Amino acid sequence: MKTKQYLAIDIGGTSVKLGIVDETGAVLVKAEESVSFDGYETPILTTVCKAAKAFVEAQGLSPAALVGVGVSATGQIDSRAGTVVGTCGNLPHYIGSPIKAELESLFGLPVTVANDANCMCLGEVWVGGAKGYTDVIGVTLGTGVGGGILTGGRLLEGARGLGGELGHYRLHALDGVPCTCGAAGCWERYAATTALVRAAQEKDPAWTNGRAIFAAAQAGNETVLALLDHWTDEIAQGLAGMVHIFNPQLILIGGGVSAQQKLLIDPIADKVKASVMPAFAEGLEIRAAQLHNDAGMVGAIYYFRQSHPER
């Protein structure tokens, strides 16, 4: 018997990932297209719709062969309306994008839209490192800090689906670094990979990205090791506060740097457990996310299936 198939779309700030995902969470085929190819002269949603239509046609599928469309999208997403209501970066023509309405019109199928970090968390819950867990915090470290929170088996979304913006938890509110959101002291200004790179470049302009920084750390560079120690302190302090609020079983850390077990994951785990009250540390697991680049697509389909159980 043929499995149900869904179109998954993961909209990022520089590219859109497209995939056909089945009812088991398997990604059957996928592709990626730039959304910034002309400096955003073409609105992101226009590029996404064109790429999605071409992708489905390239697979020899008609919309009738698909159950629905699940979208994971960067930015502040009103998941009830399926629209973009805010961003913390410079993405021209993106705020106000009616993602749900445009894709429903294009394919004649039901569409759900959720924040990308929420989708990462849901993907891990469905078929990844959080399978079988009911209380999970998922954090992605990259240009910013994204977050998804599962509590009692349900995604915490809030009134409009905007909940879980962990990166804008104001850890240094009184004397903090200005943030792209307009506030100051937001956690992502200290915990994002870009925060580590900024600090490293003040020491050596050659350390231009996470890869170069971790290579220097693995070679035993004491300056970089000290920077990493401070950076993981900042990450751990933010997570410790969240542990006291949400009492998770599991914290998953995603993003390109999450492959660094000894230099990143292990120190964060040790520091978080040392920073929380003992009862909160009991049984708490902290580890790297498993699904990597597919997490957003897989989570978008899980979100769709949760929203449309009849399909």
Predicted segments, located by residue:
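Hydrophobic "anchor" residues
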Residues: 27, 77, 84, 155-156
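Adenine-nucleotide phosphate-binding core of ATP-dependent small-molecule kinases
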Residues: 37-62, 187-189, 195-252, 257-266, ...
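Glycine/GP-enriched mid-protein hinge/lid loop-to-helix segment characteristic of carbohydrate kinases
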Residues: 2-7, 19-21, 29-32, 36-41, ...
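Short helix-capping segments at alpha-helix termini
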Residues: 59-63, 106-107, 205, 274-281
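Short glycine-rich anion-binding loops that position phosphate/pyrophosphate groups of nucleotides
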Residues: 14, 74-77, 142-144, 257
